[in-house]
């Protein structure tokens, strides 16, 4: 669903989008790569250090970090493609995998964040009734279901690879021959991949606020659990609003208002910017681990203390 690409005939028109992509994408992708690789790579290391003491929350966070790290590893290839002026040199299957990885990461991230918020809320509002749902074993099963569902539903992207034009090889570009199918896929992804999880996340936010206002709990343990639940949902909401909402909104507008005879440079540039915001979700998730992870700060202190000995 590479809706941020440009049709191959754009280079024959007086459009500025290609120059914008060449100047904008490489530097932003490389910044996201460095920041995201360090943050998620170190987070994975921290989660694995005390895996035997893991909780369901950390299982979801570990899978989220793995998804981000796998996607981050593809960004240098995207940066190279745009730096060369939209010329792909890494082969057809690599092109397919690059497009596929973007959407697998985006929607696994959305679902992991949503499930994290649900688990945090249930553990706070119904701690004893929901023990079987919030167990580590249940968390791994649910993570497996999410991975299989997202990877299978994104499988159509593996059908579309590189395209030869003159002396260049295009990748990530709109396929006008299958434009109607692309619009349909966008609406499905918008509904199932974004609006439904966002609705669930909003409900969790309202319910946890209700729980916090309903009764004052003096004990430090329950209070800490409620604080972490609220922190998880608030950070997830910020990531949704900052990274995923602009991209899904602009992607839909871009497809609905598509005009083959117009450059639509301003709209296209805005869509390009929102794609990098969506990719940047991988940089923000480590903040979630630090502020809302189970014993994440304590593990960090233990690791650094061990290094100084």
From Swiss-Prot:
InterPro entries: CLT2_recept (IPR013311), Cyst_leuk_rcpt (IPR004071), GPCR_Rhodpsn (IPR000276), GPCR_Rhodpsn_7TM (IPR017452). Residues 1-26, 78-98, 159-187, 251-271 are extracellular. GO terms for cellular component: membrane; plasma membrane. The keyword Ligase does not apply. Disulfide bonds join 95-171. GO terms for biological process: cellular response to hypoxia; negative regulation of glial cell proliferation; neuropeptide signaling pathway; positive regulation of angiogenesis; positive regulation of ERK1 and ERK2 cascade. Residues 48-56, 120-137, 209-229, 293-309 are cytoplasmic. It is a multi-pass membrane protein. The chain crosses the membrane at residues 27-47, 57-77, 99-119, 138-158, 188-208, 230-250, 272-292. SUPFAM superfamilies: Family A G protein-coupled receptor-like (SSF81321). Keywords: Cell membrane, Disulfide bond, G-protein coupled receptor, Glycoprotein, Membrane, Receptor, Transducer, Transmembrane, Transmembrane helix. The keyword DNA-binding does not apply. It is found in: Cell membrane. GO terms for molecular function: cysteinyl leukotriene receptor activity; G protein-coupled peptide receptor activity. Glycans are attached at residues 14, 166-167. Its main location: membrane. Pfam families: 7tm_1. Belongs to the G-protein coupled receptor 1 family. PANTHER family: G-PROTEIN COUPLED RECEPTORS FAMILY 1 PROFILE DOMAIN-CONTAINING PROTEIN (PTHR24231:SF48), PURINOCEPTOR-RELATED G-PROTEIN COUPLED RECEPTOR (PTHR24231). Receptor for cysteinyl leukotrienes. The response is mediated via a G-protein that activates a phosphatidylinositol-calcium second messenger system. This is Cysteinyl leukotriene receptor 2. It comes from Rattus norvegicus. The lineage of its organism: Eukaryota, Metazoa, Chordata, Craniata, Vertebrata.
């Amino acid at each position: 669903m590479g809706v941020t690409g440009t049709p191959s005939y754009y280079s024959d028109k007086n459009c500025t989008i290609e120059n914008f992509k060449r100047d904008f994408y490489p530097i932003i992708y490389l910044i996201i790569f460095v920041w995201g690789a360090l943050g998620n790579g170190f987070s994975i290391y921290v989660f694995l250090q005390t895996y035997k003491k893991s909780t369901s929350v950390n299982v979801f966070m570990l899978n989220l970090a793995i998804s981000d790290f796998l996607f981050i590893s593809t960004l240098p290839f995207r940066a190279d493609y745009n730096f060369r002026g939209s010329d792909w040199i890494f082969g057809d299957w690599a092109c397919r995998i690059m497009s596929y990885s973007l959407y697998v990461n985006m929607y696994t991230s959305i679902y992991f964040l949503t499930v994290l918020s649900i688990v945090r809320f249930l553990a706070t509002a119904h701690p004893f009734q929901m023990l079987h749902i919030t167990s580590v074993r249940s968390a791994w099963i649910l993570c497996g279901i999410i991975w299989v569902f997202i990877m299978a539903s994104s499988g159509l992207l593996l059908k579309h690879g590189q395209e030869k034009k003159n002396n260049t090889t295009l990748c990530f570009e709109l396929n006008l021959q299958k434009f109607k199918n692309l619009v349909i896929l966008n609406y499905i992804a918008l509904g199932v991949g974004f609006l439904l999880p966002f609705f669930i996340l909003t409900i969790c936010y309202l319910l946890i606020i209700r729980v916090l206002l309903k009764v004052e709990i003096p004990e430090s343990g329950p209070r800490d659990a409620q604080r972490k639940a609220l922190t998880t949902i608030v950070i997830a909401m910020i990531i949704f609003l900052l990274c995923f909402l602009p991209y899904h909104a602009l992607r839909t507008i871009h497809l609905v208002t598509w005009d083959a005879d117009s450059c639509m440079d301003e709209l296209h540039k805005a869509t390009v910017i929102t794609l990098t915001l969506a990719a940047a979700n991988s940089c923000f998730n480590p903040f979630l681990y630090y502020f809302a992870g189970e014993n994440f700060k304590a593990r960090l202190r233990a690791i650094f203390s061990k290094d100084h000995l």
